[in-house]
Amino acid sequence: MPKQLDKLLQQLITLHPKYIDLSLNRLLELLQKIDNPHLKLPPIIHIAGTNGKGSTLSYLRHIMMENKFLVHAYISPHLKSFNERIILANKEVVTSKLLKNLQYIKKINNDNPITFFEITTAVAFYLFSKQKADFLILETGLGGRLDATNVVKNSLINIITPIDIDHQEYLGKNIIKITNEKLGIVKKNSNIIIGKQKRIITSYIKEKIKKKKNTKLFYGKQFKIMKTNSKKFTLRYKKIHYSINNPNLLGNHQIENASLAVAAILRLNELGYNFSNRIINQGIFKTKWAGRLEKGQLNNIPVYLDGAHNPDGAIQLLKFFQKQKNKCWLIFGMLNNKDLLSYLKIIKPITLGVIAIKIKGEKNSFTPQQISMNCSKLNIACFEKKSI
């Protein structure tokens, strides 16, 4: 069964190339053919941004599950198996159900032009509409305004995580254009929660949404981390201070991601839900999220796995290892639409050297030779390898 699924997913990637003009029309036409499942979903929390989307989603999901809610979630990309992307009522979709519904939607689409992300999003919405849940948490794949997840008509809460330069070929060449695309998820009458941003981004967002009647919560104004220690952080939400367990996920940026999730939960309380401080703390404590400064060991040597791939992500890695007073060898691969040289410049102070690899199964990955060439420009030692 897993081999059948992998084969079908590969067919969808081949038949429907990733690089295609951004539009919602193709997906809307397909959804209409399957009775518009995107209009039959539980209350939606929709998350856009550049960094921290997946972690914020995971904190929210674990807090909600701790409160005995059934939660659907849509996540991208996946780390190990495609099933990770679709959470049905607190559980990963089983392979047999995923395969059956992929085959069905593929047949309905009848090889009409559509991207891999669009057709798999159609499958996710179809599955979500067939099973009861209390909430659906959606993570955008790319941008917001024209992201496939943005076919939904209403959302209870819109969350904007930290925004950085990324996907410029689709979203625009500067941070303001990128921010504008991310804000495209904001729906009429939804509650807007804005995470910690660069000053220029916060100013732009305030101006952009000031005429909207939505409830708006900005990091630094309506909620803010007041202090942290080794076990807890204090979050001010409006005029009340909350003592929250530190996440088990490493890095100070994870405290910021957790604070964004807690702000969303506290807003839900204002809307009539009931999440106690104990539930919030237990949910934060139990949250796990692979590939985010995930610590392991190899022959008694500490190994960290992290998916940071843009300047802000690199800065968080830099801060973490500087705080540890450690330098590390970097086993490193990156897609060729990322700013490789800027990334390497940021992490150079904590880097003993780079082992350059090509990302397995990714045609659009930098080659080890290209990574090595950029390392040479910065006098970073680099060794080229075929794989990990």
List where the protein language model places each region.
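Nucleotide phosphate-binding/pyrophosphate-handling subdomain across enzymes
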Residues: L41-P43, K130, F135-T140, L146-I159, ...
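ATP-dependent carboxylate-amine ligase catalytic core
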Residues: K18, L24, L28-Q32, P37-P42, ...
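C-terminal helical cap/extension that packs against the catalytic core
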Residues: Q197-L217, N229-K232, P302-L305, P311, ...
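Conserved catalytic-core segment of NTP-binding enzymes
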Residues: R145-L146, V152-K212, L340-S342
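Short internal beta-strands
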Residues: Y74, N191-K196, I331-G333, L352-K360
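Charged, amphipathic alpha-helical linker segments immediately N-terminal to NTP-binding catalytic cores
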Residues: M1-I20
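Hydrophobic positions on the alpha1 helix immediately C-terminal to the Walker A/P-loop
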Residues: S55-L60
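Hydrophobic anchor at the beta1->P-loop junction of P-loop NTPases
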Residues: I45-I47
